[in-house]
């Protein structure tokens, strides 16, 4: 599947695609939550869609990642949850799991506004909570979808969360001067979002100081982040928390007239206060995660004497409040990708294949459960059609 992209439109192929839409769809659903074992609330459900498919946008699923937010929803602890409904012909009100996925348009309404959509286009939903762990999905309007043609499968399937988050963090809060020696600092430098941040920032002429956990192969990991993903400099958490390093070594790293204008925090605890200390006066720290499960701690002096602003960022709420910004974000991301300034996250992802034509329900359920519970790389379910 490496390098797979949206296909061109060949009428015989897509007529065949539209005619092959099954009478029943298959989705992974839940009607309750469990903090102890969230996989136990899942089941595979086959149902006849209630929408008139001749008047709807019909999509078949190409891939969906399994994200931490998906797991938190199953646990019932995520602030944004889909509405449970009887629309899927279930005994109890249920929701389809999954917030993110890549789809292919297989049928468009016979009449009405299709926007820019064509059969064969690759698309993602504008909003979260649409239910992506399914073989087919139906949308009422073309405007509920964003075209992602031009991206490879791995980028397209993950752009709605990691890609959007990184792009908006870099571009929406600071008016950067690309001609100046301007920096952002971030912790969790090996995360998927952080890797996109360094690439997007580099494309804007912004330098990045990425903080990563101490480890035996620190130099090897730092080199990959700098050479492959465009981080300007990688430092360890020990260095991040070392005040002597901050006073003596960091100025050498940053160079003359350096301005550290933005901190991106997804860890919390001591790491968050340490990156905040490196900011210039009247700078901003954005918190978009809390991997350490420790509170964000900011020294009082930074607020009083340096005018630091600290605020939260949540991609789901941002895009709900301003869906047009999400559309523009995706377009901007695709432009950078086409220019070769963003690389595919393919190597960061472990794919799990769902035989959409021949696989049985129990195999599918076990596949998804394994994707939720196994450690290691980010998991993505890839549908084999």
Swiss-Prot record:
It comes from the Eukaryota. Disulfide bonds: none annotated. This is Enoyl-[acyl-carrier-protein] reductase, mitochondrial. It catalyses: a 2,3-saturated acyl-[ACP] + NADP(+) = a (2E)-enoyl-[ACP] + NADPH + H(+). Keywords: Fatty acid biosynthesis, Fatty acid metabolism, Lipid biosynthesis, Lipid metabolism, Mitochondrion, NADP, Oxidoreductase, Transit peptide. CDD domains: ETR. GO terms for biological process: fatty acid biosynthetic process. The keyword Oxidoreductase applies. The keyword Mitochondrion applies. Its EC number is 1.3.1.104. The gene is ETR1. Catalyzes the NADPH-dependent reduction of trans-2-enoyl thioesters in mitochondrial fatty acid synthesis (fatty acid synthesis type II). Fatty acid chain elongation in mitochondria uses acyl carrier protein (ACP) as an acyl group carrier, but the enzyme accepts both ACP and CoA thioesters as substrates in vitro. Required for respiration and the maintenance of the mitochondrial compartment. The active site is at residue 78. One of its GO terms (cellular component) is mitochondrial matrix. PANTHER family: ENOYL-[ACYL-CARRIER-PROTEIN] REDUCTASE, MITOCHONDRIAL. NADP(+) binds at residues 162, 190-193, 213-215, 288-291, 313-315, 378. It comes from Candida glabrata (strain ATCC 2001 / BCRC 20586 / JCM 3761 / NBRC 0622 / NRRL Y-65 / CBS 138). Homodimer. Belongs to the zinc-containing alcohol dehydrogenase family. Quinone oxidoreductase subfamily. It is found in: Mitochondrion matrix. One of its GO terms (molecular function) is enoyl-[acyl-carrier-protein] reductase (NADPH) activity. It is an enzyme of class 1 (oxidoreductase).
């Amino acid at each position: 599947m490496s390098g797979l992209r949206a296909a061109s439109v060949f009428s015989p192929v897509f007529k065949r695609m539209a005619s092959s839409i099954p009478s029943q769809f298959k989705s992974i659903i839940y009607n309750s939550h469990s903090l102890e074992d969230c996989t136990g609330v899942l089941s595979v459900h086959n149902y006849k869609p209630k929408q008139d498919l001749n008047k709807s946008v019909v999509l078949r699923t190409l891939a969906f990642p399994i994200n931490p937010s998906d797991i938190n929803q199953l646990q019932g602890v995520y602030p944004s949850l889909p509405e449970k409904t009887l629309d899927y012909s279930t005994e109890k009100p249920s929701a389809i799991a999954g917030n993110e996925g890549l789809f292919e348009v297989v049928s468009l309404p016979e009449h009405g506004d299709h926007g820019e959509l064509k059969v064969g286009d690759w698309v993602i939903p504008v909003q979260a909570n649409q239910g992506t762990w399914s073989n087919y999905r139906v949308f009422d309007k073309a405007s509920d979808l964003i075209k992602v043609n031009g991206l490879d499968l791995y980028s397209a399937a993950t752009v709605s969360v990691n890609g959007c988050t990184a792009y908006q963090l870099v571009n929406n809060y600071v008016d950067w001067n690309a001609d100046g020696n301007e920096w952002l600092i971030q912790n969790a430098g090996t995360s998927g979002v952080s890797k996109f941040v360094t690439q997007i920032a580099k494309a804007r002429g912004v330098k990045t100081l990425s903080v990563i956990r101490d480890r035996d192969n620190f130099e090897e990991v730092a080199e990959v982040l700098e050479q492959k993903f465009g981080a300007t400099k990688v430092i360890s958490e020990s260095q991040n928390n070392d005040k002597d390093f901050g006073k003596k070594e960091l100025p050498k790293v940053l160079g003359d007239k350096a301005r550290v204008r933005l901190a991106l925090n997804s860890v919390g605890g001591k790491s968050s206060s340490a990156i905040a200390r490196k900011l210039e006066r009247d700078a901003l720290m954005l918190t978009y995660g809390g991997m350490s499960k420790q509170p964000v701690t900011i020294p009082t002096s930074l607020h009083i004497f340096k005018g630091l602003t600290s605020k939260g960022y949540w991609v789901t709420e941002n895009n709900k409040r301003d869906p047009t910004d999400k559309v523009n974000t995706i377009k901007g991301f695709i432009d950078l990708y086409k220019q070769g300034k963003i690389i595919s996250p393919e190597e960061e992802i472990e794919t799990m294949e769902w035989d959409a034509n021949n696989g049985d329900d129990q195999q599918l359920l076990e596949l998804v459960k394994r994707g939720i519970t196994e450690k290691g790389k980010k998991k993505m379910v890839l549908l084999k059609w």
